[in-house]
Structure formats: C-alpha cells, structure tokens
Amino acid sequence: MSKYLIINADDFGYNPQQTKAIDELMRGKLITSTSLMTVAPDAANAAELARLGGYPVGVHLTINTDDSKKRWQSNSGAPSLSEKGMGLYESQVGLALHARRRDVRAELEAQYNFISSRGVEVDHADNHCATLYGINGRRFYIDAYNFCAEHSLPYRFPKTPGFLSRQIDREAPSVIKCFQKIIVGAGERRGNV
C-alpha cells in the first residue's frame, strides 16, 4: 500500500484573512488540501477560490460556532442546532443537550451541498471542534460515518488517545479511551476512518 503525506489546512472560509492565507498556501503548493467551513462568513468566497483553483477540498463539518457575538447560522436551518434562534451553539454542552440527530444529519448534507452546488468536488470530510467524535456523549459520530459512507468520502478521525487528552486538557479517563477505541473500530469497519 502506498502512503502519501497530505498537508491540510482546515477552516477555509472562516474569515477573509484565513481564506486568503489558505488560498496563497494552495497556490504556492505549500499545502496539498483544505477543508471548507460552510457556515463561516467567508465560505462562498472560499468555495469560489477552490473552484477556480481546482483545489482538493473537503467539507469541514461544523455544527457549532466560534463567534459568540456574531453566531454562525446552520446551512440547513435545523432548529435544534440553533440556540434560541441566535445561531449555532457556542457551548459544546448546549449542543450536546439540544441537538437532534436528524437535524445533525440534515446539516451534514446541507454543508456537502453548499460546496458541491458551487462546482467544487468534495474529496473528504473532517470535523470542527470534535463535535462529531462522540466525546460529548452523543452518537453524532454514527451520523458522520453514515454520511461519509453514502458520499464515498474518507473521514479524518483521531485514532489515538492523545487527541482526547488534548481536547479535555488532561489525561483521558480509561472509560473514555475505551469508548474512543469502540468508535474508531466502528469507523474502520465502515471503511471511512
């Protein structure tokens, strides 16, 4: 089996400055891939740059916001992903408590369609802020796995416990590490992790 080094910059479309930086890196062949964040403010511009440049682009599946002052809006309008009509949840806890899996799934499709409808081929998927990795206690990872399988997309998913420790800023408890192995195994059996 051949191995390839992929150097990916995610959050393409996050803001005009980041979009410009990633575009320059792609044009300069300093990175080999990017992941477009369709709910972010500069997403349409990033998609156009990707189309014009023929860039390898993934969908950076995002169901939360990073901006509490100007919250991002979902692409699907799924009600359970929006906090009191203000936009996507900033809080991982709020998202975990309120998001419905059918709304998560609808949002994943809407984000894929945002990119593909602009003439850009989506070649992989990954996730913003680990919201689809199962560490929030929700089974959104199943929705992500099924979505990727249906679209024949590889899914970038952390396979080592070191990722978990960095996410929670301490050594991950044994039960969490065990759960992560189960989630990784499920993805590997589906063939998209």
Question: PLM ranges: what are they?
Answer:
Residues 109-185, 189:
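Catalytic domains of cell-wall/extracellular-matrix polysaccharide-remodeling enzymes
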Residues 22-28, 44-56, 71-83, 116-118, ...:
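Acidic (Asp/Glu)-rich catalytic clusters
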Residues 1-66:
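Active-site beta->alpha N-cap acidic-glycine motif
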